[in-house]
């Protein structure tokens, strides 16, 4: 039985800023250059799917495969690692372009900056990315996971040297716990991929980190003869990836925008409901959300 796809035109209020400067081409080039400085870096593939294109009756279909990213099977590490670099740059009075991997891991930087403890909440990939980056950069990480998280996910994070636990809390309460502990810890920092009032700078840096993936994809499309895609599809998640992808490509193709489609599951459709209603809110607890151990999915806040 075919399942119907629900869709809505985005009715959220528009801003005067149509290009989202934080995702500007020069800003994202800094993120890309930073990630390229890691010895483990390589571009992930953009795969052409000719049979899918033929089946759908369109000219071309491409998929960006992030399963190869830094050996972590997910794009999330791009955001956490760049946010750490931006934070260290801010604390040391430098531009992030002055802090490639070789400098961040140097004895001189250790003397100048020392160590911070980066706190986060996760149901998997974001926390693993934060733990991986902290481990590589000589920093500390504390990761809280919500009730119902699998031991495999916990072990993957523990292998990266982080302090990690599974709390008897839902995802949102784990975020609150991480933020509280970061505030109470000397040199504690909350690195979360969702934003709230008063906490927007680090999520913006995380979005810029995701821009590396988008920049790669734009270059790979061009190399395969596609100057501009007609449509770009991206999963909603908690909103930061969607905001990053739309923001970057809105700058790259500013004179002729593609159609952007943000996709999410019907059981956790808060962005869809927000777009249809024209205002932000919270989606009710759904079956898919329960499976993913998240009490509710928040609307895009950045």
Please describe what each predicted stretch is.
Residues 1-302:
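PLP-dependent amino-acid enzyme catalytic core
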């Amino acid at each position: 039985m075919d399942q119907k796809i629900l869709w809505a035109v985005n009715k959220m209020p528009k801003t005067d800023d149509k290009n989202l400067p934080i995702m500007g081409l020069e800003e994202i080039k800094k993120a890309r250059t930073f990630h390229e400085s890691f010895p483990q870096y390589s571009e992930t593939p953009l795969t052409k799917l000719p049979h899918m294109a033929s089946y759908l009756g369109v000219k071309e279909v491409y998929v960006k495969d992030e399963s190869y990213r830094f050996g972590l099977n997910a794009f999330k590490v791009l955001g956490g690692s760049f946010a750490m670099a931006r934070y260290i740059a801010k604390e040391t009075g430098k531009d992030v372009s002055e802090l490639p991997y070789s400098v961040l891991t140097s004895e001189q930087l250790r003397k100048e900056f020392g160590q911070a403890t980066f706190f986060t909440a996760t149901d998997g990939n974001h926390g693993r990315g934060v733990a991986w980056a902290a481990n590589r950069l000589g920093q500390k990480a504390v990761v809280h996971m919500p009730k119902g998280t699998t031991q495999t996910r916990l072990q993957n994070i523990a292998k990266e040297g982080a302090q990690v636990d599974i709390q008897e809390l839902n995802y949102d309460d784990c975020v609150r716990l991480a933020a509280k502990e970061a505030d109470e810890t000397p040199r504690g920092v909350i690195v979360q991929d969702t934003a709230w009032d008063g906490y927007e700078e680090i999520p913006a840096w995380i979005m810029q980190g995701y821009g590396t993936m988008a920049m790669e994809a734009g270059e790979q499309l061009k190399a395969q003869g596609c100057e501009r895609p007609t449509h770009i599809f991206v999963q909603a998640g908690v909103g930061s990836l969607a905001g990053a992808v739309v923001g970057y490509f809105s700058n790259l193709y500013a004179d002729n925008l593609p159609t952007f489609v943000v996709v999410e599951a019907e059981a956790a459709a808060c962005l869809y409901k927000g777009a249809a209603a024209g205002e932000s809110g919270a989606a009710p607890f759904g079956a898919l959300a329960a499976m993913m151990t998240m009490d509710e999915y928040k609307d895009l806040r950045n």
